[in-house]
């Protein structure tokens, strides 16, 4: 962990090492050639400037691929500030390149929880020409932390007592302390932020789940676009991205031979599907756990054994959580696992695994092997390896998804930001999805790069199907 991040005199950035700029810029240049969707959007909208002067905060993994997203948003007019959405996911050379280009960025690999939430606050803090502190007009969120902080801050200013209630986790304690501090240092700040805030686009399953929960209670403060459930996000980033990046994270962390190992994948949604197929492709024997009978049946029809975590204890070599739920792997599971077991998460938050309970287990011995790899010697003498402290293994122990698949996701994010701003007076405070036509367009932008040639419908064929020759080609309810 970098305990002394570098800060510019005018708080323009807070990163690990500005000298990494050249390395970061070289990798950004490579990524641009692998991200045809984003680059096409950049060319299309650069002259139109649809986000001209719009204050945009990003809370999303500060990677090389995200750097291309940031520079696309800037090229179409946005005034951008950025933080990572995970304490381990920042690529420090990417952050350096973005800081050098003039974008305020607050992110480094190995932040503490206090540093992480302070970085989120700094990314949310814009200063008007008269010196007034305000917030963003749009947010690009990943996991919903920026959205959560604004909602909790606003609710505190309007009488909520949540900050004084018992906390479920250490991270919740950190959030509450931050909100109490801001209430003293910046009275009325969150109300000013909400007055200017026009919308949020959310990247992940976990963040979308949060949005729907808030909307169901009538407390959602702005319109939100669910980017995660765009087909060109969920069926590509979640599935094909995880199919490549999970194994990358495991191998960089442990140098482990996957062939012949028994691996348990908890969850068989899109992320679980990609993870299970990745491990099987490497020769691992894969067991899936599921709560949903449809997903369980899918896994079984793909040839995976489907059972419970409890039935695998003492046998499996690797456990991977992919669910977006909490307490999927509990302390009683970990103490019953076989010696030398590897436990990791590729869902979103670290609460999929009871990490706090593992750290607090009486008689446990914790040994750090290297960054994001911890060895726990349990009271029974068995050893358990926990990767990335239970946070995202593909970003904590490797570099996340490849550029090409992230171009799909980030093209959706950019289009969502444009849509939110153009329709800020139309959208109500609800959760929306991008229309099918835009989803298809995102896919179309990536075809030439991989040598795909589409068949074109004749007018008669289109009429027979009851669709336009140009699409959309599927109804909204179609399941890809």
Curated annotation (Swiss-Prot):
It catalyses: S-adenosyl-L-homocysteine + H2O = L-homocysteine + adenosine. It comes from the Bacteria. One of its GO terms (biological process) is S-adenosylmethionine cycle. Keywords: Cytoplasm, Hydrolase, NAD, One-carbon metabolism. PROSITE patterns: ADOHCYASE_1, ADOHCYASE_2. GO terms for cellular component: cytosol. GO terms for molecular function: adenosylhomocysteinase activity. Belongs to the adenosylhomocysteinase family. This is Adenosylhomocysteinase. The lineage of its organism: Bacteria, Pseudomonadati, Pseudomonadota, Gammaproteobacteria, Lysobacterales.
């Amino acid at each position: 962990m970098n305990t002394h991040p570098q800060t510019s005199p005018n708080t323009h950035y807070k990163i690990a090492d500005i000298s990494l700029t050249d390395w970061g810029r070289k990798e950004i240049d490579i990524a641009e050639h692998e991200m045809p969707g984003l680059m096409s959007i950049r060319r299309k909208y650069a002259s139109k400037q649809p986000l001209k002067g719009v204050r945009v905060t990003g809370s999303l993994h500060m990677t090389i691929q995200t750097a291309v997203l940031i520079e696309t948003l800037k090229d179409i007019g946005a005034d951008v500030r950025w933080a990572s959405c995970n304490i381990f996911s920042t690529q420090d050379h990417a952050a350096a390149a973005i800081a050098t280009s003039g974008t305020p960025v607050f992110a480094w690999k190995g932040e503490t929880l206090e540093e992480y939430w302070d970085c989120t606050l700094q990314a949310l803090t814009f200063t008007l020409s008269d010196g007034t502190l305000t917030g963003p007009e749009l947010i690009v969120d990943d996991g919903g932390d920026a959205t959560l902080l604004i909602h909790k801050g606003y609710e505190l200013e309007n009488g909520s007592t949540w900050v004084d209630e018992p906390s479920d986790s250490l991270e919740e304690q950190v959030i509450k302390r931050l909100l109490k501090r801001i209430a003293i240092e910046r009275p009325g700040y969150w109300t000013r932020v909400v007055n200017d805030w026009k919308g949020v686009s959310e990247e992940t399953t976990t963040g979308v789940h949060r949005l729907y929960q808030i909307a169901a209670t009538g407390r959602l403060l702005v319109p939100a676009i669910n980017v995660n459930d765009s087909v060109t996000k969920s069926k590509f980033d979640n599935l094909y991205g995880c199919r490549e990046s999970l194994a990358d994270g495991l191998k960089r962390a442990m140098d482990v031979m996957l062939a012949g190992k028994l691996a348990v994948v908890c969850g068989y949604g899109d992320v679980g599907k990609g993870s299970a197929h990745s491990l099987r492709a490497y020769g691992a024997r894969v067991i899936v756990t599921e709560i949903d009978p449809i997903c369980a049946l899918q896994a079984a029809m793909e040839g995976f054994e489907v059972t419970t975590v409890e039935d695998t204890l003492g046998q499996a070599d690797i456990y991977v959580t992919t669910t977006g739920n909490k307490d999927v792997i509990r302390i009683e599971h970990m103490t019953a696992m076989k010696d030398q077991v590897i436990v990791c998460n590729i869902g979103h938050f670290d609460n999929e695994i009871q990490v706090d309970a593992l750290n607090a287990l009486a008689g446990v011995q914790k040994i750090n092997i290297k960054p994001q790899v911890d060895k726990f010697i349990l009271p029974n003498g068995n050893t358990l390896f926990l990767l990335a402290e239970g946070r995202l293994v593909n970003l904590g122990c490797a570099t996340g998804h490849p550029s090409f698949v992230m171009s799909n996701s980030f093209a959706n994010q950019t289009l969502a930001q444009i849509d939110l701003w153009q329709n800020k007076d139309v959208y109500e405070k609800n959760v929306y999805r991008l229309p099918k036509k835009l989803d298809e367009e995102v896919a179309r932008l990536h075809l030439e790069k991989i040598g795909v040639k589409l068949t074109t419908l004749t007018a008669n064929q289109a009429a027979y199907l009851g669709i336009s020759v140009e699409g959309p080609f599927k109804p909204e309810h179609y399941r890809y």
